[in-house]
Amino acid sequence: MLSLKKGITKSYILQRTFTSSSVVRQIGEVKSESKPPAKYHIIDHEYDCVVVGAGGAGLRAAFGLAEAGYKTACLSKLFPTRSHTVAAQGGINAALGNMHPDDWKSHMYDTVKGSDWLGDQDAIHYMTREAPKSVIELEHYGMPFSRTEDGRIYQRAFGGQSKDFGKGGQAYRTCAVADRTGHAMLHTLYGQALKNNTHFFIEYFAMDLLTHNGEVVGVIAYNQEDGTIHRFRAHKTVIATGGYGRAYFSCTSAHTCTGDGNAMVSRAGFPLEDLEFVQFHPSGIYGSGCLITEGARGEGGFLLNSEGERFMERYAPTAKDLASRDVVSRAITMEIRAGRGVGKNKDHILLQLSHLPPEVLKERLPGISETAAVFAGVDVTQEPIPVLPTVHYNMGGIPTKWTGEALTIDEETGEDKVIPGLMACGEAACVSVHGANRLGANSLLDLVVFGRAVANTIADTLQPGLPHKPLASNIGHESIANLDKVRNARGSLKTSQIRLNMQRTMQKDVSVFRTQDTLDEGVRNITEVDKTFEDVHVSDKSMIWNSDLVETLELQNLLTCATQTAVSASKRKESRGAHAREDYAKRDDVNWRKHTLSWQKGTSTPVKIKYRNVIAHTLDENECAPVPPAVRSY
């Protein structure tokens, strides 16, 4: 009890749930097929909405729903502020006009061009129009943006961004918190989630969607702390689980980026979209893959080859080092192939920052100065950083409308069809605002704009507190059977061996440059790796804090994403954005301006491919005209 004034006391009994919510119903134990028989304790919960993932997109959706009065559960396999959003460095795009006059329509033009005309223009219209409002909202929540001398939000230059629809030179549109923007955003959003009493279930590993007659009705999850299984009933299930960068050997992604939500959706019989488009960031630290933000080039850094040449002037005469990421990554790869790489093996290039004033490095780039020292042994004030293109982002994911509703294809009409009960946002989703190539600093924007869109859509379509329909008592038991099979796997291959084989295959065969031969070999190799999962060995048979089990379940998810990535890439016979074919060197809008949809029900099953049209119109053509396809040059 806290004494406020004489005779007045206040009791603080505010409940915030971090590991479990009040149990709605605990049902009997379920026997497994293992010998001796094991038992799984299943606990049922009922919520209006459940959000899977507690990064930027998941938190924004979750607290938006809680704030609107919905009983909301947020599941995360790790503590929310350890989500991969924390690693985003450079900033968040919005046409605030703090450094020069700017217009969100120019931002839209740059995003469509950056997507290589594969982005859906209704969603891009919505995102860029909402961007200024979203950034100001973050500021009001307390996000500590860097400031100009007159107190406005500081904005830096980033790749692929221009003034006046590509005619006015480099735009300064990226709002930054030094080089730790994602860290600041994640903590800001987490604070709002706590304020609005979101129910958190932390260190719960979501295994599968619960479906009933084609409708998603919740998720089933494994509580790593006590080994119990939890079924979460929900009228709306939101997937915000991030990307699957760990399918590759060298990536900037956290070890937790394993495509869990994508694989859950795939196992439920729904499609994934555009998985062939994997972004390679131009500046991962050579040898470790740690990210050096594009903001380093935005502040004036530049790339050098072994001859000391600023080679980007040959590949992108206007934008130079601030061309879009796919262009810069290909240029670096071509320099290395031409023998102009640096180092003993001539297999990387250099990022020069030592010419920048020390105060700029200290104020604007403190994090990467430390990262370069720790992971490359480099003092950025004295010497360049060795860098190499590194897997960074998945443009593909769960096909989603700009409202956040997940999509599939109607078997009879071939038209888009909303999946009842399922929504997605963030890197797990494919809205598609990034198309074939994401612009730097559009990812943090994507998180908050579409996380909020999910909450708004649900608020417009669902009444809080509605009762749940009765379901079969054995719903989710197929997922438990898979958990039991994996936990008791007694094969000859360690999880780490299979994972390494997958990562090496993807790194070699589905990389920056692709040909039909390498892609076909990649499909064969990843299919063989996929089959070896049946021979996996899990040493730890327990249910409590079993990291061996969790990593094996994550590998199962990664294999689903990796296989569909390789197959989708082998089918697309053109070069567009991050998908660069040496045997089909040009973009083909007539035959290939369309989204790839892929289905795969489970590990070691065939991948089915279909296509859906790119949305070439905006939300309101009187407000904003669509951007017609054109030659993409920087």
Curated annotation (Swiss-Prot):
Gene3D superfamilies: FAD/NAD(P)-binding domain, Fumarate reductase/succinate dehydrogenase flavoprotein-like, C-terminal domain, succinate dehydrogenase protein domain, Succinate dehydrogenase/fumarate reductase flavoprotein, catalytic domain. One of its GO terms (molecular function) is electron transfer activity. It is found in: Mitochondrion inner membrane. Pfam families: FAD_binding_2, Succ_DH_flav_C. One of its GO terms (cellular component) is mitochondrial inner membrane. FAD binds at residues 53-58, 76-91, 260, 427, 443-444. The modification Tele-8alpha-FAD histidine is found at H84. The keyword Transcription does not apply. Its main location: mitochondrion. Pathway: Carbohydrate metabolism; tricarboxylic acid cycle; fumarate from succinate (eukaryal route): step 1/1. InterPro entries: FAD-dep_OxRdtase_2_FAD-bd, FAD/NAD-bd_sf, FRD_SDH_FAD_BS, Fum_R/Succ_DH_flav-like_C_sf, Fum_Rdtase/Succ_DH_flav-like_C, SdhA/FrdA/AprA, Succ_DH/fumarate_Rdtase_cat_sf, Succ_DH_flav_su_fwd. Its cofactor is FAD. In vitro, can complement a SDH1 disruption and leads to less than 15% of wild-type SDH reductase activity probably due to its lower expression level (compared to SDH1). Probable minor catalytic subunit of succinate dehydrogenase (SDH) that is involved in complex II of the mitochondrial electron transport chain and is responsible for transferring electrons from succinate to ubiquinone (coenzyme Q). Probably forms a catalytic dimer with SDH2. Electrons flow from succinate to the FAD bound to the catalytic subunit, and sequentially through the iron-sulfur clusters bound to SDH2 and enter the membrane dimer formed by SDH3 and SDH4. This is Succinate dehydrogenase [ubiquinone] flavoprotein subunit 2, mitochondrial. It comes from Saccharomyces cerevisiae (strain ATCC 204508 / S288c).
